[in-house]
UniProtKB/Swiss-Prot annotation:
BPL/LPL catalytic domain location: 29-216
One Gene Ontology term of the molecular function aspect: lipoate-protein ligase activity
PROSITE patterns registered for this protein in UniProt: BPL_LPL_CATALYTIC
Further facts: In the transfer reaction, the free carboxyl group of lipoic acid is attached via an amide linkage to the epsilon-amino group of a specific lysine residue of lipoyl domains of lipoate-dependent enzymes.
Positions with a binding annotation for (R)-lipoate: 134
Signal peptide start and end residues: none
EC number: 6.3.1.20
Catalyzed reactions per annotation: L-lysyl-[lipoyl-carrier protein] + (R)-lipoate + ATP = N(6)-[(R)-lipoyl]-L-lysyl-[lipoyl-carrier protein] + AMP + diphosphate + H(+)
Name of the protein in question: Lipoate-protein ligase A
Domain of life: Bacteria
Chain sites annotated for binding ATP: 71, 76-79, 134
Gene of this entry: lplA
Length: 338
């Protein structure tokens, strides 16, 4: 019986693909070596310990229907589109070794005619006339008895969009999380015009088989039916939830300030696990009572645009004469935390 397993996803849903990855990783026998090939439609994928409000322009992502997905490995934020080919290598310990999977990807690139090399902690680069250019970034996860190495290859990604979503507006965030490392990148199509996702997957698959001296049939994972993986439904529900993607952010503080016709407002939030643990309001408004009441209502509130709006608009019952001010405040807060 082969010790290899090859899975290929035909879904572009990041939450689906990351849930598949998690389920395979949890239930695989320690003697198995797994290759999972996949790709995502427009998504910002952040590391396990990252703060999406710091790493991403969440407002623009919402406007452009770009999803946020938190992975279970560490590392920085990256933008995925269908121009990225994603790979995951898994193995039990002591065999798990990220240098093995790195060499498999390098061999695959070499077979395609691209000479690349490992650089730094998790990148693959090619040499160009303008200097080294990154074509792949990776992250890793290990448990007591197994590990995985996953990453992306930039095939024909829309690099102009990276700055749209990974360079957020300057917010006054004092974060305790991890700030992403920005790198100079290039697409494989700059080196191999016309190269396709299918060709890259085939090269990685053949390099995988060659390394282990075995072959195995590919298993196609499709969203058309629930994958036959233990606890997949529960894992997908968690992976796609606000509580996981946003609520797992490290503790941080956020200062919002704006001047309205009726006065200036400063809001200071301390946020932990997606909930406001402290809210302070400062204003030169001639009627500060609604804002003072708002600070109390926001304590313990989810740090989510719709919840902030809900708490703000609830004050209309007690302060109907300030309806205009409260609605302006509500709209501003919702836009500021997206």
């Amino acid at each position: 019986m082969s010790t290899l397993r090859l899975l290929i996803s035909d879904s572009y849903d990041p939450w689906f693909n990351l849930a598949v990855e998690e389920c395979i990783f949890r239930q695989m026998p320690a003697t198995q070596r797994v290759l999972f090939l996949w790709r995502n439609a427009d998504t910002v994928v952040i590391g396990r310990a990252q703060n999406p409000w710091k790493e991403c322009n969440t407002q623009r992502m919402e406007e452009d229907n770009v999803r946020l997905a938190r992975r279970s490995s560490g590392g920085g934020a990256v933008f995925h589109d269908l121009g990225n080919t994603c790979f995951t290598f898994m193995a039990g310990k002591p065999e798990y070794d990220k240098t093995i999977s790195t060499s498999i990807v390098l061999n695959a690139l070499n077979a395609l005619g691209v000479s690349a090399e490992a650089s730094g902690r998790n990148d693959l680069v090619v040499k160009t006339a303008e200097g080294d250019r990154k074509v792949s970034g990776s992250a890793y996860r290990e448990t007591k008895d197994r590990g995985f190495h996953h990453g992306t290859l930039l095939l024909n990604a829309d690099l102009s969009r990276l700055a749209n979503y990974l360079n957020p507006d300057k917010k006054k965030l004092a974060a305790k999380g991890i700030t992403s490392v920005r790198s100079r990148v290039t697409n494989l199509t700059e080196l191999l015009p016309g190269i396709t996702h299918e060709q890259v997957c085939e090269a990685i698959r053949e390099a995988f088989f060659a390394h282990y001296g075995e072959r195995v049939e590919a298993e196609i994972i499709s969203p058309d039916k629930t994958p036959d993986l233990p606890n997949f439904a529960e894992t997908f529900a968690r992976q796609s939830s606000w509580e996981w993607n946003f609520g797992q952010a490290p503790a941080f503080s956020h200062l919002l300030d704006e001047r309205f016709t009726w006065g200036g407002v400063e809001l200071h939030f301390d946020v932990e696990k997606g909930h406001i643990t402290r809210a302070q309001v400062f204003t030169d408004s001639l009627n500060p009572a609604p804002l003072e009441a708002l600070a109390g209502r926001l304590q313990g509130c989810l740090y989510r645009a719709d919840m902030l709006q809900q708490e703000c608009e609830a004050l209309l019952v007690d302060f109907p004469e300030q309806e205009k001010e409260l609605r302006e405040l509500s709209a501003w807060m919702a836009g500021a935390v997206k």
